[in-house]
Amino acid sequence: MKKALIAIGLILGTITVAIIGYGIYLYSSIQNTAGEMHEPLDRGDKSDKRDVAFDISAQDPFSILIAGVDSREDTHAGRSDTLIVLTVNPKEESIKMLSIPRDTRTEIVGRGTDDKINHAYAFGGAQMTIDTVENFLDIPIDHYVSINMDGFTQLVDALGGVSVENSFAFSQNGYQFEEGEIFLETGDEALAYARMRKQDSRGDFGRNDRQRQIVEAVIKQSAQFSSITKAGAILDAVGESVRTDLQLDGMWELQSNYRGAAKNIEQLEITGEGTRINNIYYLIIPQEEIARVQGELKSHLELS
């Protein structure tokens, strides 16, 4: 995963928590951070798959794409090693979380060729990635958040660590991860946990599970009262590492209107078969599997 995870709760929750905890003193800093993070899409506010733009104040279901970008420091160019789609339904107070395997072969919208889905970010940034994911899943992507490689460890460090449920014991990068509930104290430890693939019989699918676990853990951890005292460090990490089309007022409203959905997070999986085409490895997702996942996400978004 290469230091490339961010949760909607961190973006939509931590800034609000910081305002509550630090008051007006930090407000200008928060505004500056939100401004640094803001990177609008070429398409504007409306997905091509919606008749009208998503209205935050209407409290309707919406979707957000989390892209972990294979880049360092303050750059946001590179391939997306992690693609996670969240659909959020405030009426059901639930979130569905889908990891799209990075080797998934699909059409890269805007290039007219089939390739690995994680190449879309390198070819055309957030906009091409969103267009490609929308075409693949046949749902609107209303907002996006991207984080570069160096951001992940900073965010976990700022939160003071996260708890996850480990399905089997393994070691990675000098860390030993026991079976059962474990606490990942540092960003480096969380990174090692999330990146492990070769010791897992499920390969990338197992790694995707661990990525989703950490996203869920960050959502829950960022909502805790203890995060208030860490707001400054979190904001520093966010400002340097994250890009999003959301502005500060949108983050505030989403946090206010949708935070109840974090109580119920369901992890989804899409599966396929690996193959080699021209000696390049791809994951081929059967059409019936794509249709199954599309139907579940559309239902959660109340589109069908």
From Swiss-Prot:
<keyword id="KW-0808">Transferase</keyword>
<dbReference type="Pfam" id="PF03816">
    <property type="entry name" value="LytR_cpsA_psr"/>
</dbReference>
<dbReference type="InterPro" id="IPR050922">
    <property type="entry name" value="LytR/CpsA/Psr_CW_biosynth"/>
</dbReference>
<keyword id="KW-0735">Signal-anchor</keyword>
<feature type="transmembrane region" description="Helical; Signal-anchor for type II membrane protein">
    <location>
        <begin position="4"/>
        <end position="24"/>
    </location>
</feature>
<dbReference type="InterPro" id="IPR004474">
    <property type="entry name" value="LytR_CpsA_psr"/>
</dbReference>
<dbReference type="GO" id="GO:0016780">
    <property type="term" value="F:phosphotransferase activity, for other substituted phosphate groups"/>
</dbReference>
<dbReference type="GO" id="GO:0005886">
    <property type="term" value="C:plasma membrane"/>
</dbReference>
<comment type="similarity">
    <text>Belongs to the LytR/CpsA/Psr (LCP) family.</text>
</comment>
<protein>
    <recommendedName>
        <fullName>Polyisoprenyl-teichoic acid--peptidoglycan teichoic acid transferase TagU</fullName>
        <ecNumber>2.7.8.-</ecNumber>
    </recommendedName>
</protein>
<keyword id="KW-0472">Membrane</keyword>
<keyword id="KW-1003">Cell membrane</keyword>
<dbReference type="GO" id="GO:0070726">
    <property type="term" value="P:cell wall assembly"/>
</dbReference>
<keyword id="KW-0961">Cell wall biogenesis/degradation</keyword>
<feature type="topological domain" description="Cytoplasmic">
    <location>
        <begin position="1"/>
        <end position="3"/>
    </location>
</feature>
<feature type="topological domain" description="Extracellular">
    <location>
        <begin position="25"/>
        <end position="304"/>
    </location>
</feature>
<keyword id="KW-0812">Transmembrane</keyword>
<comment type="pathway">
    <text>Cell wall biogenesis.</text>
</comment>
<keyword id="KW-1133">Transmembrane helix</keyword>
<comment type="function">
    <text>May catalyze the final step in cell wall teichoic acid biosynthesis, the transfer of the anionic cell wall polymers (APs) from their lipid-linked precursor to the cell wall peptidoglycan (PG).</text>
</comment>
<dbReference type="InterPro" id="IPR023734">
    <property type="entry name" value="TagU"/>
</dbReference>
